[in-house]
Amino acid sequence: AARTGAEIVAPDAIYDVKADIYAPCALGATLNPQTLDRITAKAVVGAANNQLATADIGQKLFERGVLYAPDYVVNGGGIINVASELNARNTGGAYDAAWVETKLSRLMETLDEVLERSASEGRPTHEIADAIAEARINAARADKAEQLKAA
């Protein structure tokens, strides 16, 4: 902290720190009725799961002009990396950096789509991300059903 000029604060005081970005990376539901009005950041970008205690918190962030990058889009890179590591371990193959990079590029495209659609549709990012995820899951289910019919 001394080298960068950062200030160390108690965990519960983090919500009151003036910052550009709030990055919840450990505990879920840190964006809740008790903390929402204390956060002054203009963006929330973190890797913790389930950052929004309730969906209406995402709506309130949107109404305040706070950019919220949905947690499962932000932390998807970790899952992608682990998938490649596990595949290499389970198959005796090598870690596939090219596959990881391709998937990460698609993840960035998804985040771009979430942000662009949020702006153009006037809807919170968490709603857009959920809609994209549901559409992809439904498409995968339909593809699987077609494969099973063909088998």
Predicted regions mapped to residue ranges:
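Rossmann-like adenosine-cofactor binding region
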Residues: 1-70
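Adenosine-phosphate binding glycine-rich loop
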Residues: 42-151
